């Protein structure tokens, strides 16, 4: 399944821990609605240190039932799909609502609204058929059919999935949408392939021999790069493939990747380069060092896209054992980004906590890679015990599995605020999206998972704590 991310405001009014997290420490459970939003917007449905994908999927089903408000669930799914671009989780919610909600007029329009691309129809049907089998509810068929009828020939051809287990034509035959020229051509087998850069590469891969395939792909990549036909994010995602299959265009590739104007107009953030960096480290490709240098430069250019935050900021990065792997990589790069872009202070914490100074001459990526991880446990209390000045906000980057000394640092946080006479806002990132909270006070927010909109939402919460909840509630859902 795809990855999901974002953050939510913390439930208020809790005065004592009321749940136990995966390591047995104290934590605070969100209300069912807030926990649902948290899980819907989290990126990590892949196996995590404490939870597997299957467990997370089951948790979603439980929360949908626990919330007991199908319209809220539907609004949250629409918000996740259209505001944050989350795909697989919206398919799951649509399938679950199709099974559990009967006789409601709004459901047909919801199923039509949840579809943003033609393959959303196929994924939603695939989920329902895999979990519940036939028959498919009429409201789901009618809603998805109405969505299919919106797409033109190019869109239908692009997502037809001719070689997939469940094809576009299978979806059309199942839901019987209103006939359109594009869908009629699809059913008759007369729809021409969409001409995209993906199909150009697919056509190159259909050559008869391995040698011809390699030559065709090299030519295809070369034409795409030299002709500047790839958007910046597509160039970033495919950098390693381009280097491997068309090394002769490495100069053009590096020039486009490091182009300051392209980076800034794409609004890409530093942490969005992480996958490209990790992919480039695989193998021993000629020219990889040059591309890595270009990525280093591009990451520094992308600091201009990071919003500023008024006042002082402390970034507290968890360096405990369970952070190893992707949470460590994304946490380090995000921490270095905030330090470089906003002048934030940096603290590492595990069994204890200490301030760390990054070399200002290092690039953002080099600075992130220089941050030492020392393993140990996760002592959230140490952050507030070691903080030596008043901060307007403290950003905590962790997998949220606090267990040292009971886990929840309620009293140390209160003592810190009293010591410096400050009302600090806490933004606590759960990099693995486990759905438990560490703090019960106002001005404290659990941010579950990750997304490329994280700075936008962080800024929104910093200005207006109830913004996200209101946004979900205000999503239009027609009867």
Predicted regions and their residues:
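Short, conserved loop/turn and helix-capping segments at secondary-structure boundaries
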Residues: 328-332
């Amino acid at each position: 399944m795809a990855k999901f991310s974002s953050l939510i405001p913390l439930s208020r009014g809790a005065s004592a821990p009321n749940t136990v997290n995966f390591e047995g420490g104290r934590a605070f459970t969100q209300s069912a609605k807030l926990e649902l939003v948290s899980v819907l917007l989290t990126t990590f449905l892949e196996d995590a240190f404490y939870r597997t994908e299957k467990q997370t999927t089951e948790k979603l089903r439980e929360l949908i039932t626990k919330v007991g408000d199908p319209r809220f669930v539907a609004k949250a799914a629409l918000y996740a799909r259209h505001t944050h671009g989350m795909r697989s989780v919206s398919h799951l919610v649509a399938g679950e609502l199709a099974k559990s909600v009967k006789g409601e007029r709004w459901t047909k329009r919801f199923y039509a609204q949840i579809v943003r691309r033609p393959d959303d129809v196929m994924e939603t049907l695939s989920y329902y058929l895999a979990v519940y089998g036939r028959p498919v509810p009429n409201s789901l068929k009618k809603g998805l059919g109405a969505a299919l009828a919106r797409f033109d020939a190019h869109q239908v051809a692009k997502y037809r999935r001719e070689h997939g287990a469940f094809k576009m034509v299978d979806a059309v035959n199942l839901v019987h949408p209103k006939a359109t020229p594009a869908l009629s051509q699809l059913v008759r087998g007369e729809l021409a392939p969409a001409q995209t850069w993906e199909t150009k590469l697919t056509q190159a891969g259909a050559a008869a021999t391995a040698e011809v395939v390699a030559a065709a792909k090299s030519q295809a990549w070369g034409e795409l790069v030299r002709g500047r036909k790839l958007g910046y994010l597509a160039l970033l995602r495919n950098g390693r493939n381009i280097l491997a299959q068309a090394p002769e265009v490495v100069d053009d590739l590096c020039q486009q990747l490091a182009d300051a104007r392209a980076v800034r107009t794409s609004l890409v953030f530093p942490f969005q380069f992480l996958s490209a960096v990790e992919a480039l480290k695989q193998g021993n490709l000629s020219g990889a060092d040059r591309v890595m240098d270009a990525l280093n430069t591009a990451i520094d250019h992308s600091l201009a896209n990071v919003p500023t935050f008024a006042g002082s900021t402390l970034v507290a990065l968890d360096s405990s054992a369970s952070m190893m792997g992707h949470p460590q990589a994304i946490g380090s790069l995000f921490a270095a980004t905030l330090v470089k872009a906003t002048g934030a202070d940096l603290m590492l914490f595990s069994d204890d906590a200490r301030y760390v100074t990054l070399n200002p001459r290092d690039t953002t990526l080099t600075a992130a890679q220089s941050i030492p991880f020392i393993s140990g446990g996760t002592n959230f209390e140490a952050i507030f015990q070691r903080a030596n000045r008043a901060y307007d906000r403290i950003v905590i980057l962790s997998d949220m599995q606090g267990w040292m000394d009971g886990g929840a640092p309620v009293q140390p946080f209160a003592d810190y605020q009293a010591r410096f006479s400050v009302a600090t806002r806490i933004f606590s990132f759960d990099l693995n999206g486990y759905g438990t909270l560490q703090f019960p006070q106002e001005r404290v927010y659990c941010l579950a998972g990750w997304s490329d909109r994280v700075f936008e939402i962080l800024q929104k919460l910093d200005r207006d704590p109830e913004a996200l909840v209101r946004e979900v509630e205000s999503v239009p859902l027609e009867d």
